[in-house]
Amino acid sequence: MTTEDTLTIAGRSYQSRLLVGTGKYQDFAQTRAALDASGTQIVTVAIRRTNIGQNPDEPSLLDFVPPSQFTLLPNTAGCYSADDAVRTLRLARELLDGHDLVKLEVLGDPQNLFPNMPETLKATRTLVDEGFKVMVYCTDDPIQCRMLEDLGSVAVMPLASLIGSGMGILNPWNLRLIIDQSSVPVLVDAGVGTASDAAIAMELGCDGVLMNTAIAGARDPILMASAMRKAVEGGREAYLAGRVPRKLYSAAPSSPTEGLIAAVK
């Protein structure tokens, strides 16, 4: 894979196609170690759950994950309405000195964390109008993804399966439809459980993968972060290389049948 094969979001290019969340680790030190092992350049931050300056008397994530070294992606985890999500991202922009690249998620159910698409579309429209560059967590419905792109999203992020489920890629066909129709990056968000899931997403043609639980919830988060880095890189290279067609039988022997050495009598 060449240095020219980069992930470009909102006009900025990145070498890594793996985006990593900062929640659920033992502490901020383990968070930083996992990020380093993953090779990520974009890290998501749940504004409602993580201190990035709101509470000056508490440890701040920014002391371990400084904006000078990573692109921070504030997200609206825990928001269940468009209004709540918009307020949260306005706060993030204020705390991060005008930072405008954000990840929107508006949830519809506290048990399965499935996205509420009507509220997501409403919030997207407002945020784009206010100058935010919005990456959107969404269903794997190609029509909804097209609507998000039409509203001005800089990336669509369909779930592979439910957040935190580790169930992997449940509907590769829908992902492929979304990839084929989209002119903005398509990143799998949610459901990745292990390295092979990340590789499959990349082999399908996704532009990147975002994960948190798959790394933070592993028995060895640092080792899993390293595994995910390799899986994303390997899956991307396999996609670019082009797999052989699936066939029940080979159309021809894999070894030549002419010019063979004659049997010794």
UniProtKB/Swiss-Prot annotation:
<feature type="binding site">
    <location>
        <begin position="190"/>
        <end position="191"/>
    </location>
    <ligand>
        <name>1-deoxy-D-xylulose 5-phosphate</name>
    </ligand>
</feature>
<keyword id="KW-0704">Schiff base</keyword>
<feature type="binding site">
    <location>
        <begin position="212"/>
        <end position="213"/>
    </location>
    <ligand>
        <name>1-deoxy-D-xylulose 5-phosphate</name>
    </ligand>
</feature>
<dbReference type="InterPro" id="IPR008867">
    <property type="entry name" value="ThiG"/>
</dbReference>
<dbReference type="GO" id="GO:0005737">
    <property type="term" value="C:cytoplasm"/>
</dbReference>
<dbReference type="GO" id="GO:0009229">
    <property type="term" value="P:thiamine diphosphate biosynthetic process"/>
</dbReference>
<feature type="binding site">
    <location>
        <position position="164"/>
    </location>
    <ligand>
        <name>1-deoxy-D-xylulose 5-phosphate</name>
    </ligand>
</feature>
<dbReference type="GO" id="GO:1990107">
    <property type="term" value="F:thiazole synthase activity"/>
</dbReference>
<comment type="function">
    <text>Catalyzes the rearrangement of 1-deoxy-D-xylulose 5-phosphate (DXP) to produce the thiazole phosphate moiety of thiamine. Sulfur is provided by the thiocarboxylate moiety of the carrier protein ThiS. In vitro, sulfur can be provided by H(2)S.</text>
</comment>
<dbReference type="Pfam" id="PF05690">
    <property type="entry name" value="ThiG"/>
</dbReference>
<keyword id="KW-0808">Transferase</keyword>
<keyword id="KW-0963">Cytoplasm</keyword>
<dbReference type="InterPro" id="IPR013785">
    <property type="entry name" value="Aldolase_TIM"/>
</dbReference>
<comment type="subunit">
    <text>Homotetramer. Forms heterodimers with either ThiH or ThiS.</text>
</comment>
<dbReference type="InterPro" id="IPR033983">
    <property type="entry name" value="Thiazole_synthase_ThiG"/>
</dbReference>
<protein>
    <recommendedName>
        <fullName>Thiazole synthase</fullName>
        <ecNumber>2.8.1.10</ecNumber>
    </recommendedName>
</protein>
<keyword id="KW-0784">Thiamine biosynthesis</keyword>
<comment type="pathway">
    <text>Cofactor biosynthesis; thiamine diphosphate biosynthesis.</text>
</comment>
<feature type="active site" description="Schiff-base intermediate with DXP">
    <location>
        <position position="103"/>
    </location>
</feature>
<comment type="similarity">
    <text>Belongs to the ThiG family.</text>
</comment>
